[in-house]
Regions:
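Nucleotide-activated chemistry modules centered on ATP-dependent adenylation/adenylyltransferase
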Residues: 1-255
Length: 255
């Protein structure tokens, strides 16, 4: 741990202890992964405690192609072996060709909502009703992913934005949620990934002419670059009432 200061060494050990306690208390536990920086840190911490802990991810038709490519790349490098939940009729070729385990979910509700959004506004659903879009493509699939779990682990952090300041390391509301890196800073996450030679999603390396960059990763239409003096999640859902907010996975009961 030569690359860490003493404060972070203590913080890291505490994060592992949070995961260890969860695994000792609950039988069925899995880690949720968005393949953003925080998820990758959470996965690595959890796998340090239990190398066999299951991983699941929720993909959407609007995720950038780089996310699919990054998933495949990191699966090979880290043996993540994720179960992918996706509202769709066909497994994306890149996932099929690389033997990624994909569970396709029905598309009828999403297709109906898309048609209604287009008819009522002339806009795609992610612009007209981002809450419904997130519910159908993220929240409902997450409910499917966790239905047999006793607890789930995620990379939520309380310094990401205004909506995450009051979360606890262990949340017990319907389904137990474990937030082992809750108190980590953005800088600590990036340092941890670098120290452990974990590649970042390529979108994080994009720097725009005005100095803005991607700091929180989501679906392509709903992710924009922001300045360093903004909160990390300010680049999510800009131009909508959800700006800097939540998709619903962390605010709605999942079970």
């Amino acid at each position: 741990m030569s690359g860490y200061d003493n404060d972070f060494v203590s913080k890291l050990e505490h994060s592992k202890e949070v995961v260890r306690d969860a695994l000792n208390e609950y039988d069925k536990v899995a880690v949720a992964c968005s393949f953003g920086k925080d998820s990758m840190a959470a996965i690595h911490v959890a796998r340090e405690v239990d190398p066999e802990i299951p991983i699941f991810t929720i993909l959407t038709p609007y995720k950038p192609v780089e996310t699919f490519e990054y998933l495949v790349d990191m699966d090979k490098k880290m043996n993540i072996n994720p179960i992918v939940y996706l509202v769709g009729k066909e497994v994306p070729p890149i996932l099929k060709d690389n033997n990624i385990n994909v569970k396709l979910l029905p598309t009828d509700k999403f297709e109906t909502a898309c048609k209604e959004a287009e008819k009522e506004s002339g806009k795609p659903i992610y612009e007209y009703d981002p809450d419904k879009c997130c519910t159908l493509l993220k929240v409902d699939p997450t409910k499917e992913a966790v239905k047999d779990l006793d607890a789930w682990v995620c990379g939520l952090r309380n310094t990401e934005g205004r909506t995450r300041k009051d979360y606890k390391e262990v949340e017990k509301r319907g389904l137990v949620k474990i937030n082992p890196i809750l108190t980590w800073t953005e800088e600590e996450v990036l340092s941890y990934l670098k120290e452990n030679e974990i590649d970042l999603h390529p979108w994080y390396s994009k720097v725009f002419p005005d100095g803005r960059r991607i700091r929180s990763l989501g679906c392509a239409p709903c992710t924009v670059p922001i300045y360093d003096n903004q909160e990390e999640r300010d680049g999510r859902w800009q131009g909508t009432s959800k700006c800097g907010g939540e998709c619903g996975i962390h605010t709605q009961r999942l079970k």
